[in-house]
Amino acid sequence: MNISHTRREFLQWGALLLTPAGFAQKVTPNRVTTFAGTGLRGTAAEGDTAGHARLNNPFHIVIGPDGAMYFSDFGTSRVFRLDFRTSKLSIVAGTGTKGFSGDGGPATSAQLNGPHEVRFDSKGNLYIDERDNHIVRHVEMKTGTISTVAGTPGKNGYAGDGGPATKGLLNQPHGITLDRFDNLYICDPLNNRLRRVDAKTGVITTFAGNGEGVRAPDEGSLTGTPLAGPRSLEITRDGKWYLALREGNGIFLLDGAKKTVKRIAGNGDSGYSGDGGPAVAARFGSLGPGGLTGPKGLSVSADGKTMYVADCENHVIRKIDLRTGIISTAIGTGQRGDGPDGDPAQCKLSRPHAVLVRGRTLYVADSENNRIRRLEPA
């Protein structure tokens, strides 16, 4: 796939909303709208318009270097591109059938299995973590060729540190990100570790976590601290690293230079409380399917002042003022439901897995409503 559209085009269209008919209109501030999906679960096809497409558990969303939106559709095991100018979808990776195949060939002919997060490196190439194949894959966007860069397809476990990442073992990787040097970081939640793949050597190591899935102290060392269920890692423009712990019900600041971790949100207990007070005293998550709790996705504003958190099992998006440390709810009621669009305080969500802030616009992967929603704050 050849990236041809520019970031400038995205910025020009970023203040417009794609309606279900596929046309653009001005966004009404402080109202939630449906950006993509009908709410009906199905299989989106090449060329579908955003408002007519039937999504199936959209899990993660990013803006690519071409200014388009890319998202993983967990239920169909595909990755899609959404063009802001035309509102049309195109398939980037996956056949729609779960499995493992296709390395060395076109990503659109490859089988994926449970894609969670998608990210781009500095060269504009795409990375996909596949939970149920226990791997991370790479798509060369100029050619569309897919390959495996970490993990052993179909095999789970914890092994391989110090050797080639493609011979290592992961256990249901859920989140990925890349630093400015294109080193790859993998949230390896069932191993309770954050793994790192060196961009130059391809060697995998453990970057953070000691493998214990117990409650973490408020501060500790990178590799000596228990990190229960690392779920998503966000690296900000100003170089701060934030890690969400799913089973740990917290968010931690990682300092690579000092090799330390520090709690900045979540007291470690599950629940839904704390709005209006310190984020470190708040509770995230509640017992959901499989007993999963805690935050599932993070996004920080470009100025570094605000963090948004997908509090999946509470069916809300939380907001943290990183200057004051105060937490609040940005979207959702705390009850599971489907909208209605409009007032963010009254719009019910259903297990949102990801949130993305770009400029003043907030996008939400409202996963089990099979929608991507949008909020333009007042």
Describe these PLM feature segments.
Residues 1-18:
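N-terminal secretory signal peptides and thylakoid transit peptides that target proteins
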Residues 27-57, 87-114, 144-172, 201-229, ...:
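Gly/Pro-rich loop segments of beta-rich domains
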Residues 63-66, 120-123, 178-181, 235-238, ...:
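Residue-level detector of Asp-centered blade-edge/turn motifs that repeat once per structural unit
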Residues 68-70, 125-127, 183-185, 240-243, ...:
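Conserved beta-propeller blade signature
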Residues 74, 131, 189, 246, ...:
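Short loop/turn segments immediately following the C-termini of beta-strands
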Residues 78-80, 134-137, 192-195, 203, ...:
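A short loop-to-beta-strand structural motif that recurs across blades of beta-propeller domains
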Residues 351-378:
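Blade-level signature of beta-propeller repeat domains, shared across WD40, Kelch, NHL, RCC1
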